[in-house]
Design a protein with these regions (language model features):
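Thiol/selenol-based redox catalytic cores and closely related redox-interacting motifs
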Residues: 41-128
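Generic structural marker for isolated residues within well-ordered, non-membrane alpha-helices
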Residues: 19, 38, 72
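Thiol-based oxidoreductase modules, predominantly thioredoxin-like and allied folds used
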Residues: 28-42
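Glycine-rich, phosphate-binding/catalytic loops in enzymes
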Residues: 24-25, 75
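A short linear-motif detector with a strong N-terminal bias
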Residues: 11-14, 35-38, 99
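Local sequence-structure signature of Cys/Sec-based thiol-disulfide redox active-site neighborhoods
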Residues: 1-24
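Short, structurally constrained coil/turn elements
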Residues: 25-27, 52
């Protein structure tokens, strides 16, 4: 079975913490997690660098692409083996609320505390 790929902002403290949290939940190692700054990562799923600057992305093992809050919910569902996060996200009303909150987080992500950014910890991962 191939892994899903979660693409996140490796220069963001909050994003790095979220990625690390998902990795801890993913005991079966179903998700490969990479910063979009890593050479070739955006292109490997048909995305541009600019698209990855705007949101996190997750490509499932069947090729489905999820963006933003959808990518987070898909990652949680895959990591835990529980469809509930993604099922809730797909419910009308909940999706709109989560997407709105996600947009706020994206706007202020570099002000939200978290871990030392991935690209600061692993500079070789972020060389383009």
């Amino acid at each position: 079975m191939s892994q899903a790929l979660l693409i996140f902002d490796g220069t963001c403290d909050f994003c790095t913490r979220a990625a690390r949290w998902i990795k801890k939940l993913d005991r079966q190692q179903r998700i490969r997690i990479e910063p979009f700054q890593k050479a070739g990562i955006p292109e490997s799923v048909g995305l541009t660098y600019a698209q990855c600057e705007q949101a996190a992305w997750l490509q499932t093992s069947d090729g489905t692409l999820w963006r933003g809050a959808g990518s987070v919910n898909a990652a949680l569902s895959i990591a835990t083996g529980n469809r509930l996060p993604l099922s809730l996200y797909q419910t009308w009303g909940i999706r709109q609320i989560q997407d709105s909150v996600y947009k706020l987080i994206v706007k202020y992500r570099h002000r939200i505390p978290g871990d030392t950014p991935h690209c600061q910890q692993f500079p070789a991962d972020c060389a383009r």
